[in-house]
């Protein structure tokens, strides 16, 4: 059985020691363990939504299937491009707003992992002072914060 091309989309670039690196590690493992082939492309960090849309469209036109968008910032682009390519499967990580039959939403219970991080921080703190930096105030990171705070409070 010949495998279809596999496409992954990474927003930003490798080297952020966070979300994008975790996605890239998953791609690397899939390439090694599952023997899938993929093409990795990125839009300019902080670039226009139209650039994300163009990149996704080019991948779909090239026959990559599935096309995976990493991050909620791709929601608008995935919605537009997936509608144009109904035979192509799309997936988006950290967004569940797209109601199209060819789009899979890959979402997580962020507050559960951050709850455990809050517990670990509370147990490790010698001063009783604990901080959390979420970067930006968006619903996704507010869920992280709520889980972290709940974990800290549950430990006291």
Feature roles, as predicted:
Residues 1, 6-33, 39-52, 72-74, ...:
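Extracytoplasmic "Venus flytrap"
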Residues 63-71, 91-93:
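Periplasmic-binding protein-like
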């Amino acid at each position: 059985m010949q495998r279809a091309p596999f496409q992954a989309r990474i927003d930003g670039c490798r080297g952020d020691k966070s979300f994008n690196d975790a996605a890239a590690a998953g791609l690397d493992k899939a390439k090694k363990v599952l023997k899938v082939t993929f093409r990795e492309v990125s839009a300019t960090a902080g670039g226009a939504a139209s650039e994300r849309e163009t990149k996704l469209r080019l991948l779909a036109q090239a026959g990559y299937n599935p096309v995976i968008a990493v991050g909620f910032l791709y929601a608008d682009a995935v919605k537009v491009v997936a509608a144009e390519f109904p035979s192509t499967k799309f997936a988006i990580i950290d967004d569940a707003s797209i109601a199209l039959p060819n789009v899979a939403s890959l979402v997580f219970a962020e507050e559960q992992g951050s709850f455990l991080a809050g517990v670990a921080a509370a147990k490790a703190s010698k001063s009783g002072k604990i901080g959390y930096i979420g970067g930006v105030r968006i619903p996704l990171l507010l869920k992280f914060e709520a889980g972290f705070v709940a974990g800290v409070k549950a430990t006291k």
